[in-house]
Amino acid sequence: MAAAAVAATATTTLLLLLLCVLALSQAFYLPGLAPVSFCEKAEEHLNCLSTIELYMNRLDSVESVLPYEYNAFDFCKAPESKQRPTENLGQVLFGERIEPSPYKVTFKEETACAALCEPKVYEPGSAVDQANLDFLKKAMHFNYQHHWIVDNMPVTWCYHVDEGKLFCNPGFPVGCYVTASGQPKDACIISTEFKEPDSFYLFNHVDVTLSYHSGAAEGWEGARLVAAKVVPRSIKHAVNEKPTCTGPPLSIPQSGTERVTVLYTYSVSFVETNNIKWASRWDYILESMPHTNIQWFSIMNSLVIVLFLSGMVAMIMLRTLHKDIARYNQMDSVDEAQEEFGWKLVHGDVFRPPRKGMFLSVCLGSGTQIFIMTFITLFFACLGFLSPANRGALMTCAVVLWVLLGTPAGYVSARMYKTFGGEKWKTNVILTAFLWPGLVFADFFMMNLILWAERSSAAVPFGTLVVVLALWFCVSVPLTFLGAYFGFRRRPIEHPVRTNQIPRQIPVQSLYTRPLPGTVMGGVLPFGCIFIQLFFILNSIWSHQMYYMFGFLFLVFIILLITCSEATILLCYFHLCAEDYHWWWRAFLTSGFTAVYLLAYAVHYFRHTERHTHTKLAIEGVASTILYFGYTLIMVLIFFLFTGTIGFFACFWFVTKIYGVVKVD
């Protein structure tokens, strides 16, 4: 009954936490970001601007992992007098490259079919012209998307999808392609005019609509932008005439034997929309994201199932152990105890130091560093500090925290290594500081070389790599040494029972208590509580969707913590009952095996992404495939250390507790 009450209380607490987090998530702009007011040109002053700056972010595609800067294409360029905005560390590492645009937008000054720059002419005999045109064709073939920013919010392309639902995409395509058989691809399906076989249609005109909330009736000056929408169009403008933005679409044949002239034009209109508040201006984007509503029900269903299973595991463990310990302590005969209690028989071997204790302690140190970093990052994300409106903040926060958390990594690694009886403290601290971070950086650097070779905007500049290395060597490494110093100065962790000099022979094990089957089974339940969130996280990374439901993610993090702990404890108990006392590595690998399921799911996502998400992943090309699996490997390694550390310390606590409450002669 007590166990049931504890489980019920835990469930209630978690559900209350969910409600609190969801309430906090409504305050999207609560911390750190202030609104900008805009006025007409005649009323402009320091706190009320008339010029609306339009910025261009990188162009990306769901069919390629290689993003490119706006200026990598032969589009109209911004004047050199315009300054490029400064990007933070997180933006650079994520591959964001924000540049000023050539578009001129003034508040409440509407523009109709204005030429953006001089026409672009591509001669069939010019190698430079054909290279520029071929690069544009590549962008249209792989459905590359523009990403524009106005007043720190994305310019969206809204269109109707299944069942008439309005979907607002924070990007719009460069153009589209009609195959040689006449089959329109991607955005070419929106119009029957796109019908020329084996032809590209470049979207060279945009209709931009800016919605604003006026402060005239609310006592504050000017107006605030609450929505920015764009409608791309393909128009074949008449040569040497003033553009009218009417006429057939601009068709570019696959063959480069014809002269192509491209004139880029734009229109801007303003709409007063006072029913949308500035603080909730992202709602129309977030609410239209694919499967947003389904995610609520799926996650709740998953959480209820996981909580139910966790409660059952907790009740079984508490009741079984309570009876075992009570009955054992009442027995006077050692023979009686040996008859019924397998886990008690190995008390003299259960704390025997593990093989490869050096490597295990290094894994635990790095895993602790990742665990604390993840917890703090998700906590700040729940409070709204790391929302999509605060660009690059999530990655910046994670990197800075990882650097500053070298001390607990060194301390845990040193303390556990000393507990294992290790004496090579120099090797331990060096491996803790360099082994896993070095492997991750080596993988990241190899991926960066590919991005450099492909001239992608996602390639991290050399200067930023130097900064990352400086943070690692000059901050993280010294802090790791400092933590290791304090760890080695402490006494080893005292075990509740003594270890025998002669190891006990382990009996023949049944199938489910052998190392491999137990390890494979141990990762199933933890993976079951994250795979729904994992789908949306992978969509955010590879399909360029916004991820903003950090409240759910934090709750899933807590459930993952509980599930990894309980699954590892349960299997550890079964192995001890089978008189197998080699639990150290098994505890780490049991929960760490969840990372193998993560890898399998990433492979499945790569090959069979759902076809009704409006962001179907269809990566093509050797470079993109290598990049996908290279970055996936980094994610899997980090997740392996994270989950393995959770399972190990849960099992370590469990074993210490149960052997601390029994009477040993």
Please provide the spans of the model-predicted regions.
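Transmembrane alpha-helices of multi-pass eukaryotic membrane proteins
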Residues: 10-16, 293-307, 357-369, 389-406, ...
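Membrane-embedded alpha-helices of multi-pass membrane proteins, especially ion channels
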Residues: 20-31, 306-319, 369-385, 405-418, ...
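Interhelical loop segments of eukaryotic multi-pass membrane proteins
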Residues: 35-42, 318-344, 377, 384-396, ...
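Hydrophobic alpha-helical transmembrane segments corresponding to the first two to three helices
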Residues: 283-453, 485-486, 490
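Cytosolic juxtamembrane regulatory segments of multi-pass membrane proteins
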Residues: 337-351, 502-518, 594-597, 665
